[in-house]
Amino acid sequence: MPVGTNNFNLIGITQKTNSSLDPATAVKGADATVDVGVLQYTRAFSLAGNASALAVVMPFGEVRGEVTLSGPLGNNTITRESSSSGLGDVSVLGVFGIVGSPAMTRQQYAQFKPGFSLGALAMITAPTGTYDDEKLINLGTNRWAFRVGAPFGWAIGDSYLSPRLTTIEFVPSVTFYSDNDAPFRAGNRSQEALYRIEGHLTHNFNRAFWVSADLTANTGGETTTDGKSDKNSKTWTGGGLTAGMNFSPAFGVSATYGGILSGNDAAPEGDGFRINGRYTF
């Protein structure tokens, strides 16, 4: 984005899954519905002559469902219903250009011929969301998360505003977690790092309409509760398709359908829809 650009996004998400809004919280035996909105504000600026941006992300809404647990004798099951509503965990995200993404004015941005680019990503998620240690399913996570990554990719076209622009982007990243000091029916829960790589292929069909195909691969995230491993390391792949329409330079809407394509027994499950409205000024 050109330096000085502001984006407001209002996102609606509905999904059937076995986790909260964060897939790293997947619980085997859970059957949950997540209905949330997300407010995001992004500001583009120059850092050491490179294009950079900061974003603040605030989710809100409800997660509800039921969890099937093993009974006290191990040979029967117990089903517990649960719901959580309110605000989710707030995130602050920074993306910083390193190669191929100079800071530009709007006029320079329109004339710039893109190519390869490499950047750095850093995100902090704070435990601000609704959380109750008597519930297995919560909107908040009661722990900090720290994500770092190195997005890189190629843009093929005469400019970023080209009506036939194609972009290929990869985002390798790792997320680290602090301990949850009030997990369900326990005293402490730690979680190993989660490793992730995203791939995005986006093509403009004209100045207004574009589509994107998305893939992710994830592994890690095993938890340890009160010093005992939960043996729930997660490995999964996910995918999705997005179609977007720009009604003007200031306003656009996109719709995404996506879900889990494959995974082990501890992995998140399900699929969902997302609608994203964008206002740029």
Q: Where are these predicted regions, by residue range?
A:
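Transmembrane beta-barrel strands of outer-membrane/channel proteins
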Residues: 8-16, 54-60, 118-126, 166-176, ...
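Outer-membrane beta-barrel translocator domains and adjoining extracellular loop/strand segments
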Residues: 18-25, 65-73, 105-110, 130-137, ...
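Long, hydrophobic/aromatic-enriched structural stretches that serve as scaffold segments
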Residues: 33-102
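Short loop/turn motifs that connect adjacent beta-strands in outer-membrane beta-barrel proteins
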Residues: 1-4, 46-52, 100-117, 157-166, ...
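Residues on the lipid-exposed face of transmembrane beta-strands in outer-membrane beta-barrel proteins
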Residues: 10, 39-43, 92-98, 122, ...
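Outer membrane beta-barrel transmembrane domains
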Residues: 19, 180-281
